[in-house]
Amino acid sequence: MRVPEVLIKKIFKIANHYGEDAQVDMLIEEMSELTKALLKNRRAQKGQTDTPVRATVNAIEEEVADVLIMLHQIIYLGDFEDLEDIIEEKLDRQLERIEAEKEQQ
C-alpha cells in the first residue's frame, strides 16, 4: 500500500510535534492492541467468543492503520539509512527459503 503524500505530511507533522520518545511508546502500545485484536479474531474464528468474526476483522483493520501510522513516524524520526536494503535482503532470503522448500517436495 502506497501512502499518499498528503497523509505522509500529516504523519510527519504529528511526529515532529510529539517527538521520538513519545511515539516509540505509542508504537509499542499500538502493536500491543494489534496483537490483542489478532488473538480475538482467532478466538472468534474458533467460536470461542460472542464477538462476530467481522467485528474482529474491523478491529484488526483499525489497529493495522494505527501501527502503520506509528511505524511511518518512527521511520521518519529515526532517519534510517539502510532500511530499504535491509527489507530487500530479508525478502530475498525468505524467497530463497520458499524455493528450497519447493525443491524438497
Language model: regions and residue ranges:
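Flexible "arm" and connector segments at domain edges
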Residues: M1-Q105
